[in-house]
Amino acid sequence: MHDVPWTLTREQFNLEAVLGLKTQTTLAVIVPAKNEASTIGAVLDAISTHAGLIDELVVVNDHSSDDTGVVADHHGARVVNLSGTSGKGAAMSAGLRATSSELLVFLDADVINTTTEYVPRLIQPLLEKEEVQLVKGYYERPLHNMPTGGGRVNELSARPILSLLYPGLGEIKQPLAGETAGRRSTFEAITMETSYGVEIALLIDIAHKFSVGALAQVDLGIRRHRNRPLEEL
């Protein structure tokens, strides 16, 4: 049994193979967003480059007080408006209910350098390995003017705690990453945490229900996001 997560490096990414295999299934991309009018348009434009890749593009607008929904609609997404602030996990669940595709990709709306390869990279393990149920992105996170240093909560808290629960989970480089892909059947087989704890809960639930070997992680390069004040979270 494969008891550690699968890892897809940048060198192993094969866009042509992904586009070919994708024709055999359907894909929804879901972007939970709250007050991300300044970044959501660029995110949607970047991921919409490859014709025929995405069958459903949905932005779940979590009670934004800015023009997030308007901008998302202008950039081609179907907008699902939540009536009140619900939390990231609840927004992800709303996106799940609003779509019907077999494969799902969840992306953060505040990333300022989302690339055209995010979506195909995230689904490659799902297309190539039937045993993979959930995929997480990993990346370098510059901090201020330093090339690395971001993601300290991952290194100091999340990974050590996960290692205590399931040793193989400590191999996940970015357990708190919002860039996630999986199979509809997998998401429907578990109970989604409603808050920001959804990222950790997904890993634990998948490892428990399937195995650590049902997880994969893919290299997304360098990630930069808009830092928000605490009251916006």
Predicted segments, located by residue:
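Acceptor/aglycone-binding surface of glycosyltransferases and processive sugar-polymer synthases
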Residues: 92-94, 116-186
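Active-site donor/metal-binding and catalytic loop motifs
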Residues: 216-233
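Short, acidic, metal-binding catalytic loop of nucleotide-sugar glycosyltransferases
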Residues: 45-54
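Conserved donor nucleotide-binding strand/loop of the catalytic core
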Residues: 55, 69-98
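Short aromatic/hydrophobic "clamp" motif used to bind/position activated sugar donors
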Residues: 104
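A conserved acidic beta->alpha catalytic loop
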Residues: 61-69
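N-proximal low-complexity "stem/linker" segments adjacent to membrane-targeting elements
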Residues: 1-45
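Catalytic donor-sugar/metal-binding loop of nucleotide-sugar-dependent glycosyltransferases
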Residues: 194, 204-221
